[in-house]
A protein has these predicted regions:
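Acidic, polar ligand-binding/catalytic clefts
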Residues: 45, 143-202
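Bilobed "Venus flytrap"/periplasmic-binding protein-like clamshell domains
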Residues: 101-124, 159, 179-251, 260, ...
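Short beta-strand-to-loop elements that line the ligand-binding cleft
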Residues: 130-137, 234-245, 283-287
């Protein structure tokens, strides 16, 4: 049985008999599900599950980076911090009656809404405005929402931040403190506990599970690392499987569905602490030397300055977790270099 590129451990619906409202709803939704599945098929095949080396290299930059590496001409950056300036024209400033917020788009967005309710309460307290969580499961959809003003406050995954800054006017402000007084995580390669794969060099001839093409630790960083350190290219020296997310990659390793996966260490720890995987279920065969910045929270560049300040006050006062202010120009320098390396893929 082949592994589904989106769900490595598919679980069939439980068998049932007799009439039930759920069965009726299920039956009426079949045509819709088919349409969505077909659309999803064409989306997935636009980024091949096991891309041939030549086609992969030719299309890599456009698929992953495209025009996302430079600040859009719609914005200005007078102070050179690489982030869109707040408009000087008062008519271009917004002061919404209700603040719309969303954490990193993921399959567990509903659970994230519950997790971040205390933060929303804090923001409501400091701004005096009601705060509503927007459920989003797709990164590109989250980018679109932010660009269209359907989100005012958000956290984007580390690899998506440059696109959010350059295309949508996202202003990163802070990242959660993960250990002691530090923020961030490492990219790790993990394998099933009984795997014969012991080093990154052993990935040659194997299949690497990656999360999605916008992910830094789940896609861009591992591919550039294997290329630069071992001259290994996907589609030529090893194959790829798109899992759809870090949690899916980790579950695939736990069930022996994947040979090796690239994931973020903080998400691995979080899932392990929640009982989703045990330490004895996997082994880490490589951990990146550099500490990657954790997914940052930020706000829209065109919010009124006084509203921006009140939002910052909420993050500064919040303690579970604590947040640490970040510098996009400094802290995302390495991420931007990886993006540049992807753009110059064929030159290596």
């Amino acid at each position: 049985m082949s592994i589904d590129p989106i769900n490595p451990t598919p679980i069939p619906p439980p068998a049932s008999s007799g009439f039930s409202l759920a069965n009726v709803i299920f039956a009426t939704l079949i045509p819709t599900i088919i349409i969505v599945a077909v659309a999803g098929y064409f989306y997935i095949t636009a980024i091949p599950e096991n891309p041939g080396n030549l086609d992969f290299q030719i299309g890599l930059a456009d698929r992953v980076i495209g025009d996302r590496t430079k600040l859009s001409e719609a914005f200005t950056d007078a102070n050179g911090d690489l982030v869109a300036d707040t408009p000087s024209d008062a008519s271009k400033l917004v002061d919404p009656e209700k603040l719309l917020i969303s954490h990193v788009a993921s399959a567990d967005s509903i659970e994230q809404a519950k997790k971040w309710q205390p933060l929303m309460d804090m923001i409501q307290k400091t701004t005096g405005k009601p705060v509503e969580y927007v459920i989003l499961t797709d990164t590109n959809e989250q980018l679109s929402y932010f660009k269209e003003g359907k989100l005012h406050i958000a956290a984007f995954n580390t690899g998506t931040v440059p696109a959010a800054v350059n295309l949508t006017g996202f202003v990163p402000y802070c990242s959660p403190v993960t250990t002691g007084s530090t923020t961030g995580y490492q990219m790790v390669f993990i394998v099933p506990k009984e795997s014969a794969i012991n080093t990154p060099a052993d990935i040659k001839g194997k299949t690497l599970a990656v999360t999605n093409v916008m992910s830094h630790s789940g896609y861009k960083m591992p591919l550039t690392y294997l290329r630069d350190e071992f001259k290994m290219y996907p589609g030529k020296d090893y194959d790829l499987r798109l899992s759809g997310g870090h949690a899916q990659s980790i579950k695939g390793i736990q069930s022996d569905g994947y040979e090796v996966a690239a994931v973020a260490s903080d998400l691995l720890s979080s899932i392990q602490n929640a009982g989703g995987i045990k330490e004895g279920d996997y082994r880490v065969i490589h951990r990146s030397d550099t500490n990657q910045p954790a997914a940052p929270w930020g706000y829209a560049y065109n919010l009124k300055p006084e509203l921006q300040d009140k939002i910052k006050q909420a993050f500064d006062a919040y303690t579970d977790p604590k947040f640490q202010p970040i510098s996009y120009a400094k802290d995302w320098d390495y991420i931007r270099k990886v993006d540049s390396a992807m753009l110059n893929w064929n030159s290596k």
